[in-house]
């Protein structure tokens, strides 16, 4: 028995070292080769994007739709990019465990975007984005950031320990945090905001006219500006003005 276990250990070590693919239980394990390759893929007909698993998604807005993926050469074929009901889904193949040694990077050009979803440990970045309404959700420990957002309505949902950082302007923002997530938007100008925090989440935002806040747990909400504030606190949470 010990000999068999030792042989199994040697086999796994050799597979890892050589960037091989092995099957352990129901999952197909792919160990990154270390050699990075870039591939262009045609995508069209979407106004939403979802990143699953790990990786970095960089979004730019313009007149065309295009996707470029950089990853290790034996991992790249295992990355799915498909449009389903108007949503571009980016994720590993099902029943596949990717042990990458180099970052997985998606560069996505969009015409318009109404929704961004992040599930897992990934990272979504955009230098600027213009949308009438934007729904942004983070589930897990991932992070999302937009350098300059222009929107009429912004809806943000954070479930878990993820984080969202935004700057720019939105007429109205609706923020929902469940868990220990963080929302950083003190540089995002808004007129009205509705914030719901359940757990130990932390929220910082800028609002000028009206702020409605509900905190259940030990969460904190800090605001910049002089809005009228309506607050409900259940637990040890706090609502305070910055400065």
Roles of regions detected by a PLM:
Residues 1-243:
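Intrinsically disordered, low-complexity terminal regions
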């Amino acid at each position: 028995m010990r000999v068999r276990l030792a042989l199994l250990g040697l086999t796994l070590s050799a597979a890892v070292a050589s960037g091989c693919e092995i099957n352990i239980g129901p999952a197909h394990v792919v160990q990154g080769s270390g050699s990075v390759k870039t591939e262009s893929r045609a995508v069209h007909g979407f106004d939403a994007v979802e990143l699953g698993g790990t990786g970095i998604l960089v979004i730019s807005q313009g007149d065309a739709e295009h996707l470029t993926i950089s990853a290790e050469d034996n991992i790249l074929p295992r990355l799915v990019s498909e449009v389903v009901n108007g949503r571009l889904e980016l994720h590993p193949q099902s029943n596949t465990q990717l042990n990458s040694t180099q970052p997985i990077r998606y560069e996505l050009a969009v015409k318009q975007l109404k929704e961004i979803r992040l599930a897992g440990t990934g990272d979504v970045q955009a230098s600027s984005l213009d949308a009438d309404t934007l729904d942004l959700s983070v589930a897990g420990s991932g992070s999302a950031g937009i350098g300059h957002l222009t929107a009429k309505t912004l809806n943000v949902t954070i479930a878990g320990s993820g984080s969202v950082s935004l700057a720019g302007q939105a007429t109205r923002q609706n923020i929902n945090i469940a868990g220990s997530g963080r929302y950083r938007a003190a540089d995002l100008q808004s007129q009205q905001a509705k914030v719901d925090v359940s757990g130990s989440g932390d929220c910082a935002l800028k609002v000028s006219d009206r702020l409605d806040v509900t905190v259940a747990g030990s969460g904190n909400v800090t605001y910049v500006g002089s809005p009228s504030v309506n607050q409900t606190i259940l637990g040890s949470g706090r609502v305070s003005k910055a400065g």
